[in-house]
């Protein structure tokens, strides 16, 4: 089982044994319930599907109700699938104790959406800058986006203004600083994608 579903609580700081002030992120990870076990015979591959956070039946679609009732678990708001070889069975509960203090984890989440942004904020451009001969009101403009008659087009991938943020982001190798099993809290060194309350996938 390589990971669990969690929720970002917020950021804080913790002093290490050496006296360093470490920026940390607090996440509520689990408890997650196994809602489906996939096998090679039936599905063509082996995997485990887990659910996180209960929801009311009135907010659950008819196919979802059948799915959860077959597994004998309560209705879950979030689902995730992890590649795993037949170690778990439907109904098993996996808590934050799945992780250990001192290990390194990868965290996947959706970054904060910034809306439509220009090239200075989105790509770190300097802008056209000084008002030299013929320049006016171009301090934050991108400058040239290509040549003229050849190639007579703008190449794909050219950095321009556009939607910024609200994309899937993975932060790798974050050290687990502390585990608080009583409250299902996992504290890692550094920052993770998303705002407070956003859903995360935490992988070993």
From Swiss-Prot:
GO terms for molecular function: rRNA binding; structural constituent of ribosome. InterPro entries: Ribosomal_uL3, Ribosomal_uL3_bac/org-type, Ribosomal_uL3_CS, Transl_B-barrel_sf. Pfam families: Ribosomal_L3. One of its GO terms (biological process) is translation. PROSITE patterns: RIBOSOMAL_L3 (PS00474). SUPFAM superfamilies: Translation proteins (SSF50447). Gene3D superfamilies: 3.30.160.810, Translation factors. Transmembrane segments: none annotated. This is Large ribosomal subunit protein uL3. It comes from Azobacteroides pseudotrichonymphae genomovar. CFP2. The lineage of its organism: Bacteria, Pseudomonadati, Bacteroidota, Bacteroidia, Bacteroidales.
